[in-house]
Amino acid sequence: MSKTQVVHYEKWQSFAGDLLVFPLGEKPEFSGDMKEIANIYNKLEATGDFSGKDGEAVLLYSSQLKKSICGAERILLLGLGKGDKDSDLQRDLLRQTGGLVAQKAAEIKATEVLVVIPTLAGRKSADTLEPLVEGVLLGDYRFLKYMSKKDAPAPYRGLKVLALSFAGAFDKALERISERAQLAADCGCAARDMAHEPGNGWTPKHFSRYAKKLAKSHSLVCTVLGKKKMKKMGMGGLLGVSQGSKESPQLVVLEYSPENPRKTVLMVGKGLTFDSGGVSLKPGAGMEEMKYDMCGGAAVICAMKAVAEEKPDVRVIAIVPATDNMAGGGALKPGDIISHYGGISSEVVNTDAEGRLILADALAYGVEKYCPDYVLDLATLTGAAIIALGHHHTALVSNSDHLVELATRAGAKAGEPVWRLPLTEEYRKQIKSEVADIKNVGGRPAGTITAAAYLEKFIGDTPWLHFDIAGTAWNFTEKKYIPKGPSGTGTRTLIEFIRSLG
């Protein structure tokens, strides 16, 4: 649950907190109770200090004003631009404005902030409210768990109260939209928390503990398969990757099952709690960031909280194959051959291409057991995705044009854009092995696509989406609502995807 309390104010003039915020577009229209703000805007526009352009910000102190207009110590005017962008772009600009609110609050160490939600031409209040609230809460995120309390001065710990007021009337529908935005932001921040945890603070068993706790508090069904059960079921990928580690692998399953669901959706997330590369050891520089190799697992688990609270008419199953990839004495070696759940054999050419090995078992198991209508998997799978798309788009591979359309809409709405890559027979040939059914590396060319081709072997004919979030899960493209570090990417896209179905 968010540390920030979100409340609603009938009249912004009665707010006596640290910071009062007015997001304003160019040439805004002011309602009757905004006369004083209109006067301030007109003076600032005349002097060239503020005109409402996108990204503009002016901080005023109430004590400097000739006439007191509220009890807040400071007033912040933020520019929204002309508001002529397409709906998804405008939505993300509003989200970024919310992030800027959080940044400005941090600069002055404000803990109580009120945002007056504007009425923009051609947009409903709900369309403005949701991304603004998301942006503030996502932008206010910080991970301070391991900061010593002996430090002086104490670090700023973010907003305690986010108050909302409206230029127009507030009603129950807007309250629900506000709660919806809070939930999506909370889930995204929970995924960031998991990714921030070091390898010694988040092990495979932490995934299972978190899932069990979530199941208990939200009436979900949780099942955890351990090493003994995996051996019996022939999950050679997950078992093989875990061989070099002292941590026991876990296959964590969460189920939400309404009566008479319209669809069944299987979500699988890579839960590699630390990736050294195994025997195919990674370079030392930057290896500390390999704690983030479980961001796919974090996304699917945290999205289940939103599913459980919103109760869509869709059955949703989340599976996280969790382990770490270490180079201990029993570790997989290049050239080893493993057998996946269902019997497909694989030649392990490179032990640092381990994500597809653990996902394959989880996908095969989930498809067989739950017979889903749709399968989605998320993984920080390939460096090739970063080479292809940088840190601005998540790579998407699919066997279904319809699902790609749904995923593209969901990603755009969440501010987490995706870009589809092809998957044709030429790429499938790259993973053919001379000694097994397939091999886990298809050479340097098209690494993101050949990794997806590997996973495709385990989903049968089920419509399927593969999200390679390697480039977007950490230090995602510069956005004001995404602080440095893990972004939580994928969590809100999954939430929007399920919302579109249910």
UniProtKB/Swiss-Prot annotation:
Task: Kindly give the InterPro entries that the UniProt entry links to this protein.
Answer: Leucine_aapep/pepB (IPR011356), Macro_dom-like (IPR043472), Peptidase_M17_C (IPR000819), Peptidase_M17_leu_NH2_pept (IPR023042), Peptidase_M17_N (IPR008283)
Which molecular-function annotations from GO does this UniProt entry contain? manganese ion binding; metalloaminopeptidase activity
Q: Which cofactor does it need?
A: Mn(2+)
Catalytic activity of the protein: Release of an N-terminal amino acid, Xaa-|-Yaa-, in which Xaa is preferably Leu, but may be other amino acids including Pro although not Arg or Lys, and Yaa may be Pro. Amino acid amides and methyl esters are also readily hydrolyzed, but rates on arylamides are exceedingly low; Release of an N-terminal amino acid, preferentially leucine, but not glutamic or aspartic acids
Q: Which GO terms describe its cellular component?
A: cytoplasm
**Active-site annotation:** K282, R356
Q: List the disulfide bonds.
A: none
Q: Which GO terms describe its biological process?
A: proteolysis
How is the co-factor bound, per the entry? Binds 2 manganese ions per subunit.
Q: What is known about what this protein does?
A: Presumably involved in the processing and regular turnover of intracellular proteins. Catalyzes the removal of unsubstituted N-terminal amino acids from various peptides.
Q: Which PANTHER family match?
A: CYTOSOL AMINOPEPTIDASE, LEUCINE AMINOPEPTIDASE-RELATED
Family membership, please give it.
Belongs to the peptidase M17 family.
UniProt-recorded name of the protein: Probable cytosol aminopeptidase
